[in-house]
């Protein structure tokens, strides 16, 4: 049986169309590629969650939900204690975004997995779901958050809303509704309800509230679905009704086609981007281009005369700290991070971006030979580099992090990240656990790297 074409899902509204699609989409409809992306995304999510479990915000949220108690239904990263589904989603979402090292999607400038995976894992455990249904819900959640985020548009983000938290809540609601086997009416009520719950503002960036936004998105999705299951009635069109969520949270005209075109045929979730370097995502195209130059030419730092980097103009305001002094500042420095890569340092490791690196004389010497200029011809996911060697040779590369990567190469990059964060033994153990595909086994993750 083949799934229906996208036109058949276009009913009265974006929300009702996405609900109809989610209800009709069965596990057998998912391609191997979709399953691979979902599996890699869950693995990457677990990696950054385990690595972030000891961050201060992680301790605070875990301690808070411990103080509240409740049904012992669901696992939380960093403890063997179990919690109610909503609390588990809140904690796991926050923990997974604590390092800001999780995946992103440039279609809506948000982080998809930190909202989707915690909701899926919480209700997967609570309902003792079968693997096929779990992965089906994850795929639908990742697609929903991306399409709603893209439909809300850049204006939503630029107005000050945190798309990870807002669009993420709608994606988490679809996940939760699917795992609870809600019917069409109840799922629409759940989406309507979460329209009153989705929140998060960019003024919180740089504080502990930012990772909490991810936990809120996951928890709101779970709670909205549970309320709908209990019979709570909302306006099912509140996402796009007059005085509804979109009407009050964005000023631009919204094109329904962005949310619905190609639904079920063209999958936006395949364009999810995983972070392979422990720094601002705006640096990643540059670092990948420099890696290509270094590896292709067996380049060593002492043979470099100078480095020229061209980047999209907006990143000069975001990640162009000329002479960083702290590890955090190093994560926002084109020049220092370029020097790290060209010196052969592992930029996937959190420890690489340190105050000691900022004082390293070899890195400083090379950093001072790096220049960065804006190029309006580059997309926001591209960078181009030129390295001049001491014998006058010019080595060039251009890289777009939004390009499609083969599964094998993407897995290798994520695995190298896992090695850097968890160590090889723990990384392989985690991969084997995720590869079982059984969410009822995922609680064993707390035996990996538990502090």
Question: What residues fall within each predicted segment?
Answer:
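Broad structural signal for hydrophobic residues in well-ordered alpha-helices, predominantly aliphatic
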Residues: 123, 176, 194, 293, ...
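Short helix-coil transition sites and intra-membrane helix breaks within transmembrane domains
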Residues: 107-113, 161-166, 279
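Glycine-rich, mobile lid/loop segments that gate access to catalytic sites or pores
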Residues: 125-128, 132-223, 235-242
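Hydrophobic mid-domain F-helix/FG-region of cytochrome P450s
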Residues: 41-48, 118-120, 167-178, 338
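Well-ordered alpha-helical scaffold segments within catalytic/enzyme domains
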Residues: 52, 120-127, 173-179, 225-228, ...
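Terminal-appendage/accessory-domain detector
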Residues: 1-109, 206-219, 226-451
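Hydrophobic face of alpha-helices
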Residues: 35, 39, 43, 116, ...
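Hydrophobic alpha-helical hairpins/lids featuring a short glycine-rich hinge
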Residues: 92-150
């Amino acid at each position: 049986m083949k799934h229906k074409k996208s036109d058949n899902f276009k009913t009265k509204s974006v929300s009702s169309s996405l609900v109809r699609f989610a209800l009709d989409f069965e596990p057998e409809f998912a391609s191997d590629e979709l399953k691979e992306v979902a599996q890699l995304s869950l693995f990457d999510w677990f990696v950054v969650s385990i690595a972030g479990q000891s961050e201060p915000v992680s301790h605070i949220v875990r301690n808070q939900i411990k103080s509240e108690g409740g049904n012992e239904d669901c696992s939380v990263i960093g403890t063997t204690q179990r919690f109610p589904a909503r609390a588990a989603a809140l904690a796991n979402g926050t923990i997974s975004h604590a390092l800001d090292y999780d995946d992103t999607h440039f279609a809506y400038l948000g982080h998809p997995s930190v909202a989707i995976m915690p909701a899926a894992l919480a209700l997967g455990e609570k309902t003792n779901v079968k693997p096929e249904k779990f992965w089906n819900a994850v795929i639908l959640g990742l697609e929903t958050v991306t399409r709603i985020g893209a439909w809300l548009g850049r204006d939503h983000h630029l107005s000050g809303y945190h798309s990870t938290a807002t669009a993420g809540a709608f994606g988490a609601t679809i996940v939760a509704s699917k795992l609870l086997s809600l019917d069409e009416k109840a799922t629409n009520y759940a989406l309507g309800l979460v329209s009153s719950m989705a929140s998060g503002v960019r003024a919180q960036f740089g504080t502990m509230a930012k990772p909490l936004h991810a936990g809120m998105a996951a928890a709101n999705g779970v709670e909205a679905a549970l309320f709908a299951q209990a019979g709570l009635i909302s306006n099912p069109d509140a996402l796009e009704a007059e005085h509804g969520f979109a009407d009050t949270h964005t000023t631009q005209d919204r094109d329904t086609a962005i949310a619905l075109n190609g639904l079920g045929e063209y999958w936006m979730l395949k364009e999810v981007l995983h972070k392979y370097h422990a720094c601002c995502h705006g640096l990643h195209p540059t670092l990948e281009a420099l890696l290509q130059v270094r590896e292709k030419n067996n380049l060593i730092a002492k043979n470099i005369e100078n480095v020229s980097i061209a980047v999209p103009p907006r990143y000069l305001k975001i990640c162009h700290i000329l002479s960083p002094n702290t590890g955090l500042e190093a994560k926002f420095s084109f020049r220092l991070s370029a020097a790290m890569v060209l010196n052969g340092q592992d930029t996937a490791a959190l420890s690489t971006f340190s105050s000691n690196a900022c004082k390293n004389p070899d890195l400083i010497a090379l950093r001072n030979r790096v220049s960065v200029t804006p190029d309006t011809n580059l997309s926001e996911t591209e960078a181009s580099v030129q390295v001049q060697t001491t014998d006058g040779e010019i080595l060039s590369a251009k890289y777009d992090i939004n390009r499609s990567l083969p599964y094998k190469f993407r897995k290798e990059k994520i695995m190298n990240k896992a090695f850097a964060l968890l160590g090889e033994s723990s990384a392989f153990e985690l991969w084997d656990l995720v590869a079982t595909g059984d969410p009822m086994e995922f609680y064993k993750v707390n035996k990996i790297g538990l502090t």
